Amino acid sequence: MIVCIAEKPSVAKDIARIIGATTARDGYMEGNGYQVTWTFGHLCELKEPDDYTPMWKHWSLAALPMIPQRFGIKLINDEGIKKQFATIEKLMQAADSIINCGDAGQEGELIQRWVMQKAQAKCPVKRLWISSMTDEAIKQGFQELKDQGEYQSLYLAGLSRAIGDWILGMNATRLYTLKYGQNRQVLSIGRVQTPTLALIVNRQKEIDNFVSEPYWVLATIYRDTQFTATSGKFTSKEEGEKAFSTIAGKPFKVTDVSKKKGNEAPPHLYDLTSLQVDCNKKFAYSADITLKLIQSLYEKKYTTYPRVDTQFLTDDIYPKCPQILNGVSQAKIMSQQKYLPLIQQLATISKKLPKSKKVFDNSKVTDHHAIIPTGVPPTGLTDMEANVYDLIAKRFISVFYPDCKFSTTTVLGEVINEDGPKPEKIEFKVSGKEILEPGWRVVYAKDAKNADDDDASDNANGNADSGNGAKKEVVEERTLPSFTKGESGEHQPTLTEKWTTPPKYYTEATLLRAMETAGKFVEDEELRAALKENGIGRPSSRAGIIETLFKRHYIRRQRKNLMATPTGIELIDTIHEELLKSCELTGIWEKKLRDIEHKTYNPADFINGLKEQINNIVIDVLSDNSNRRVTIMTEEDLKKKPAAKKTPAKKAPAKKANKAAAQNTDSQNVPAQPAPAADPMVGKPCPLCGKGVIIKGKTAYGCSNWKAGCQYRQPFSQM
């Protein structure tokens, strides 16, 4: 008898139907020489500390670090799991061979291997490796079964990850809880969750310590078009007024008019992170909700395997694309066959689907390709599932459309003042764009009318705010009047006072991008390359990490913004071991784990390195003689209304200078704002480091020496 083991009952039933195992038994299906059983995700886990020795049952600093001689696994303590495992064990011990039908990935491999080890399976094992749950994919997968030994390095990488998380998490959590937790709550430390929390805390500190400063922008309106000075902003009002005086009453002259045509390629297909980002921006879905929705669509056979980190397809998918598009065209979303016109229009553009390297690239795909529709027309979707399917379907359709073609017009101008001994010149510039052929943008034409956030290429081409404020420019239409080089005339100059603004708080969308592209936070080139591929955590785990931070009361949600709680802030401040809270930790781990998977690094060396690392951390923390403690937030604390933010008492600057006043040399700039009332705290020596002085942020006082490591922070609400 051949025993097949799947990761979920629903998946097992689909497989059983395809291979003819149609008789239902208690915990499995049987027929045609097969027995198809299932797990419920993880049935096994690594043993707890007290499973190794009674000395580790009670939390004690003296027992740290806890390093078992040999790591073992055990059944999760659940009656339903125990019953199902008994069925699996009985089937496997009598089996002639086993087919591992777990999810095709590192975690899926680990789940099934542990079950087979616990059941003491001795027979040969084959591996089913598929990227979708359609009947065709399952049939093809059974025709192309692999020997499980081909995936041994994948299993070893997953096992090393689990053991590493145990060594770090179990020891560091007990260490920090006992040392700094006031015996009120567990202070959870994790390889992924702690660097993620540090991202949120550090961003919040940047905002709290931010001091808004004024600057001035010189512009002028010529023929109802606003030109901006190319010299940039002025940090001094006097400099701005001087430049304004130079151009007031002098003619404006157009010095150059240039046009340049360009193309904008369709956005990349979705991987899990980019899908979660878009769902958060467009529908305010959390990363965890999006993962559940796309997992549901996958299990219903409407989309391909979701837990992926690539945005490319393999070449063998290309011949199947016409059939997939045909299936998508028949889909009815909210009672509308909305994709049929788009696919029909695609057929009029080209007789054969284009095959672009930006879509099909074998070198960019490892275990699974990007998330795409399977071609099975969806029925009975919830509104939330329909929203997610709509994103995936439109993205897939759009990659076969031509590029969007546009024309960029740049107009340069100048104002020359020859009244003085030496002529003075101020140069200006304005740019506009005109879409010549919308190309793939027709797929998103209706979406673009709804809101600015619905722009199709935002995030998809890496345009999302990833934590440093950088955002790639996208094509937005702005048509300029026709200008001629050499023309001149009157203009209306303005000098506008503005204020610098702090960074934005993370949302789930921008945090996911920061987790994915964490390479920008480290200096080492090799680590940066590893982080670009793997980021902080894996695509499938990031949603869970964010949810864990909420459950631990380390962060809270204020509208769409993610805010660190006092517990979260103080925990990060308490952790002096940079390796625990920096992106470099994950970079080091991910690179070594990837090397294990590629058979170029020894798992034993990985584990031994972690043992040495945790031993050093324990020594360092135990030698800390300070009386630092972490404030523990309770559920009731989080329910209390946050204190209102206090900001420096200054009026918002005027958005635009008065045109008439701008032409008057006696009133040639925006009126100066009244100076904020003097704050007696500001400027005093820092009571913590003694090197900096106290500065005033948006919600708290801080130290001017904060970038150098001073952690002084006094919230306004505690004054």
Task: Please tell me what each predicted stretch does.
Residues 1, 102-104, 183-186, 259-268, ...:
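Conserved short loop/turn motifs at secondary-structure junctions
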Residues 1-162, 166, 170, 448:
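Intrinsically disordered, low-complexity regulatory segments
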Residues 2-3, 118, 287-288, 309-719:
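Basic, low-complexity terminal or inter-domain segments flanking catalytic cores
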Residues 23-28, 148-153, 174-178, 205-210, ...:
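Active-site phosphate-binding and catalytic loops of NTP-dependent enzymes
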Residues 72-98, 199-200, 278-279, 391-397, ...:
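Phosphate-interacting basic helix/loop segments used at nucleotide- and nucleic-acid interfaces
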Residues 80, 93, 135-216, 220-222, ...:
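C-terminal or mid-to-C-terminal helical accessory/interaction module adjacent to the motor/catalytic core
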Residues 237-270, 276:
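Metal- or metallocofactor-binding catalytic centers and their adjacent structured scaffolds
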